[in-house]
């Protein structure tokens, strides 16, 4: 039996909707990264963008275990001497763009190359419950019910 290698004609992209409310951030990011890569498909081909389009809603209500909400830091550098800056996860989640926490978590689980950048364009994250992709008729994936460890109440 020959090894199957997908061609662009074989790729069929679906739309998947995930509600992040109460879901643990790392577990959500792992599931989303695998869907974006296409590793959940039997026709997975490593060098092609096989993954589905993923819509994440309620990103501002994502949970973190332990003290990560207060202790986890997101660093950047201004380019000037002594210009290292940081914000905690709590500051980002309570700020103007809380969806960036989810985007960063998924981005850091995807390959850091041109294919990874292409796969990240298939991710849409929204802080609230509304999204403009109803016309695509996304199928709902309930991450919270996949494993009891995927949720955290407090």
From Swiss-Prot:
A GO BP entry: translation
Pfam families: Ribosomal_L13
GO cellular component, one term: cytosolic large ribosomal subunit
Functional summary from the UniProt entry: This protein is one of the early assembly proteins of the 50S ribosomal subunit, although it is not seen to bind rRNA by itself. It is important during the early stages of 50S assembly.
UniProt subunit comment: Part of the 50S ribosomal subunit.
Assigned protein family: Belongs to the universal ribosomal protein uL13 family.
Name the record gives this protein: Large ribosomal subunit protein uL13
Record GO terms (molecular function): mRNA binding; structural constituent of ribosome
NCBIfam families: rplM_bact
Family annotation (InterPro entries): Ribosomal_uL13, Ribosomal_uL13_bac-type, Ribosomal_uL13_sf
Keywords noted in UniProt: Ribonucleoprotein, Ribosomal protein
SUPFAM superfamilies named among the record's database cross-references: Ribosomal protein L13
């Amino acid at each position: 039996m020959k090894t199957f290698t997908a061609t662009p004609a074989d790729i069929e992209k679906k739309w998947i909707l995930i509600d992040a409310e109460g879901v643990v951030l790392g577990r959500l990011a792992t599931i989303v990264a695998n869907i974006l890569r296409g590793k959940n498909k039997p026709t997975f081909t490593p060098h092609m963008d096989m993954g589905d389009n993923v819509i994440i809603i309620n990103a501002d209500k994502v949970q973190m275990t332990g003290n990560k909400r207060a202790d986890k830091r997101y660093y950047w550098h201004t380019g000037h001497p002594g210009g290292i800056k940081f914000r905690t996860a709590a500051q980002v989640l309570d700020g103007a763009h809380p969806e960036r926490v989810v985007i960063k978590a998924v981005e850091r689980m995807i390959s850091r190359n041109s294919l990874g950048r292409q796969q990240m364009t298939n991710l849409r994250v929204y802080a609230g419950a509304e999204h403009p992709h109803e016309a695509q008729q996304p199928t709902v994936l309930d991450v919270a019910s996949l494993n009891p460890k995927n949720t955290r109440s407090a």
